[in-house]
């Protein structure tokens, strides 16, 4: 019997067993328990197959840290953020580093941090990559491959810019006559780089609750890990 057929039989038995006034509540409870059970089984299977780090890349403020942290908690894995690691190494915020040393030196420092991470970090794990890290000229394709399975979070540019504007524009945009135009230009340059580097793409054309975004991300990972 198919799964839908089995579920139909079980629901009929529930409705036939409990008092009519409690039948709808009993059915809802059954479906909640079933959903939790399926979710746990899904995570167990993915954990058993996942043998690499999951590295989330994408434009600045696409939600890598938020979603990466949530994914790590869902899978019971450690979480890292390359910007946070760089801040720890330098002893100051990423924006301050960039403003003080300029982009060329910033990319060199970023590459040092990433290579140190590759050499020492556990695997599997989840890591959020800095917005420009995939296009860092100091890093090689081998460096990117060593980070893990790269998943590109493809979000609309206006969504990311709106989030960034709320927090305050970074140095590379703050002095531009039209920051939104410059951000669009940067994103247009980086999109093909993200696509070329990515092992998988997570498309997020609309703003979603984190639970729904995680569900989509799990589906993407399953397509790459379980089917191989």
Task: Please describe what each predicted stretch is.
Residues 1-49:
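Domain-level signature for soluble enzymes in the chorismate/prephenate branch of the shikimate pathway
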Residues 82-142, 169:
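ATP-dependent small-molecule kinase phosphotransfer cores
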Residues 130-134, 156-158, 207:
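Short glycine-rich anion-binding loops that position phosphate/pyrophosphate groups of nucleotides
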Residues 50-54, 122-124:
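Pre-Walker A (Motif I) flank of P-loop NTPase domains
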Residues 54, 70, 74, 145, ...:
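NTP-dependent small-molecule kinase module
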Residues 65:
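Walker A/P-loop
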Residues 59:
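P-loop (Walker A) phosphate-binding loop of NTP-binding proteins
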Residues 146-191:
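A glycine- and Lys/Arg-enriched "phosphate-lid" helix/loop adjacent to the NTP-binding pocket
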């Amino acid at each position: 019997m198919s799964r839908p057929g089995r579920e139909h039989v079980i629901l009929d038995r529930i409705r036939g067993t409990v008092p009519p006034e409690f039948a709808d509540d009993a059915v809802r409870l059954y479906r909640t328990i079933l959903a939790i059970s399926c979710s746990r089984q899904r995570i167990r299977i993915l954990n058993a197959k996942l043998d690499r780090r999951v590295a989330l890349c994408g434009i600045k403020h696409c939600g890598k840290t938020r979603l990466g942290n949530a994914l790590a908690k869902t899978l019971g894995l450690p979480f890292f953020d390359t910007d946070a690691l760089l801040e720890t190494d330098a002893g100051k915020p990423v924006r301050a580093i960039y403003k003080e040393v300029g982009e060329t030196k910033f990319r060199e420092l970023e590459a040092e941090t990433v290579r140190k991470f590759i050499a020492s970090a556990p695997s599997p794990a989840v890591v959020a990559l800095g917005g420009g890290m995939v296009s860092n000229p100091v890093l090689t394709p081998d460096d990117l491959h060593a980070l893990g399975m790269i998943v590109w979070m493809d979000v609309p540019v206006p969504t990311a810019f709106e989030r960034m504007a709320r927090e305050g524009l970074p140095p590379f945009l703050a002095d531009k006559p039209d920051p939104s135009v410059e951000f669009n230009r940067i994103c247009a340059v980086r999109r093909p780089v993200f696509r070329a580097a990515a092992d998988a793409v997570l498309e997020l054309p609309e703003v979603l609750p984190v639970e729904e975004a995680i569900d989509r991300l799990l589906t993407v990972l399953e397509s790459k890990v379980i089917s191989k």
